[in-house]
Structure formats: C-alpha cells, structure tokens
C-alpha cells in the first residue's frame, strides 16, 4: 500500500438534496466535488460512500407494511447507486479519475466491489465510490462505510454532516450545546450519541478505526482535517 494518507468520506443522501429535501442539488454536488478534489490534489487517497435518503429510505418505505423491509432496503441500495453515479459525474467534470464499485453486481453501470481492485484504483490516484451499501438488507450505509474503510485500510472515516461535530445535545434545539472534541467509542454508544448506528461504531472500535465528524459545508475543512491543521473543526471518536 502507498504511504499516502487514505480516507473514506461518508456523506448522507439528504445532504445532496439541499433545501428541497429530495433529489439532487447539483450546486451542492459541485461543492462536494471541489472539496474532494482538494484532498486528491494534495496527495490523499480518497474513497466515498453516499447514503440514499434523498431518494428513499428502506426503513421508511417499509413502515406501513406494504413494502417488505428487505425490498425497501434493496430500493435504498439502488438509491445509493444513483447518488454515486451523480457524484462520479461531478468529480470527473472536475478532472478527477473516478470508479464506482457496487456491492450488487450491475456491470452495465459500474464495477462490482473487489477489494484488491479498489486498492489498485486508490494507489493510482483514482477516487473510488462504494455503492449499494453492504449488499445486504438491515445494514445502514454508515455500517457499509465503516466496513469498506476497514477492508481498504483507511486511516480514518470522515462523516461529513451539517453540524461542526458531535454535541452533548442537539445544537439546533439547545443554545448551550457543547461541541465534544473527542469521545470514546464506548461513550458514543452508551450515551446514545448519534454519531453512527451502534453496529458501525462497534465495527470501528473492534478495528481501531477513528471516526471524525465534521461540517461538510465549511469550505476547506476536509483538507484542514487531513493536514492536521489546528483550525480544523471536527469531533473524533476513538
């Protein structure tokens, strides 16, 4: 493996939707692509996982029982493929070499996930987008992102959100909410702090994978995090 820093960045599908709450806002897509390009230009090996909540959520689709949970989750996996293709387009328009790898075989659209091939792409400076979650129902894209990060030997997983990091309570509801700069995996799970679901956190803990939570809309913040800039704004779970 290369000596370069390797990171997996996890974006929610809702983040792509912008104010509309549904679909894909191409202005946001371009903003994210520019932030990723900064990392690649500065020598970082980057892979990405995007949720599908801007299109459909498996849990929500199955809520009234008309659609089975397994089918709902498969629909959600397909939504992540749509988002991944959109992100590939934005990154390629920015001059980057990109590959989408899906956990579910769909040769006409993208590659099938193979860890060795993903590693080779990253070593060649390509951005790799992992789509379709784990390929199995009942697992979130946070868990999929953690799994892929471990499989490809990522130094960290960055969860890009709409807030500056992890707070002791909801900063949108409480003005006195405090940003937690660092917390343990155990605290993140026991206090039910919504960093990721418990399966993802437990997987990260078992493999000593740091989880960094940051605001995706702070321009240049991703690069500051990777560069270990003191001005970087994030929380770390380790």
Swiss-Prot record:
Q: What UniProt keywords apply to this chain's record, in alphabetical order?
A: Allosteric enzyme, ATP-binding, Cytoplasm, Kinase, Nucleotide-binding, Pyrimidine biosynthesis, Transferase
Quote the record's binding site residues for ATP. 10-13, 53, 57, 161, 167, 170
Identify the InterPro entries for this entry.
Answer: AceGlu_kinase-like_sf (IPR036393), Asp/Glu/Uridylate_kinase (IPR001048), Uridylate_kinase (IPR011817), Uridylate_kinase_bac (IPR015963)
Gene Ontology, cellular component aspect: cytosol
The pathway is: Pyrimidine metabolism; CTP biosynthesis via de novo pathway; UDP from UMP (UMPK route): step 1/1
Which catalytic reaction applies to this protein?
UMP + ATP = UDP + ADP
Q: Where is this region: Involved in allosteric activation by GTP?
A: 18-23
Cited Pfam families: AA_kinase (PF00696)
Any single GO molecular-function term of the entry would be: UMP kinase activity
Q: Where does UMP bind?
A: 52, 73, 134-141
Look at the named UniProt entry and state the broad enzyme category this protein falls under: transferase
Q: What does this protein do?
A: Catalyzes the reversible phosphorylation of UMP to UDP.
Protein name, UniProt field: Uridylate kinase
Organism for this UniProt entry: Campylobacter curvus (strain 525.92)
Q: Which gene encodes it?
A: pyrH
């Amino acid at each position: 493996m290369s000596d370069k820093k390797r990171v997996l960045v996890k974006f929610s599908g809702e983040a792509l939707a912008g104010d509309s709450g549904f679909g894909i806002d191409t202005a946001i897509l371009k903003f994210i692509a520019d932030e990723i390009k900064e990392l690649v230009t500065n020598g970082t090996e980057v892979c990405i996982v995007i949720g599908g909540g801007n299109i459909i959520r498996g849990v929500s689709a199955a809520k009234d029982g008309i659609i089975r949970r397994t089918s709902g989750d498969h629909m959600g996996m397909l939504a992540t493929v749509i988002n991944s293709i959109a992100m590939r387009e934005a990154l390629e328009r920015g001059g980057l070499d990109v590959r989408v790898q899906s956990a579910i075989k769909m040769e006409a659209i993208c590659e099938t996930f193979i860890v060795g091939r993903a590693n080779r792409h990253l070593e060649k400076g390509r951005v790799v987008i992992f789509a379709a979650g784990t390929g199995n129902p009942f697992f979130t894209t946070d868990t999929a992102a953690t799994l892929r990060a471990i499989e490809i030997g990522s130094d960290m997983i960055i969860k890009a959100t709409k807030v500056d990091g992890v707070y002791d309570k909801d900063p949108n509801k409480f003005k006195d909410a405090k940003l937690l700069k660092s917390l343990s995996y155990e605290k993140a799970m026991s206090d039910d702090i919504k960093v990721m679901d418990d399966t993802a956190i437990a997987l990260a803990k078992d493999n000593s994978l740091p989880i960094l939570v940051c605001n995706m809309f702070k321009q240049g913040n991703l690069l500051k995090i990777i560069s270990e800039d003191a001005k970087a704004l994030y929380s770390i779970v380790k």
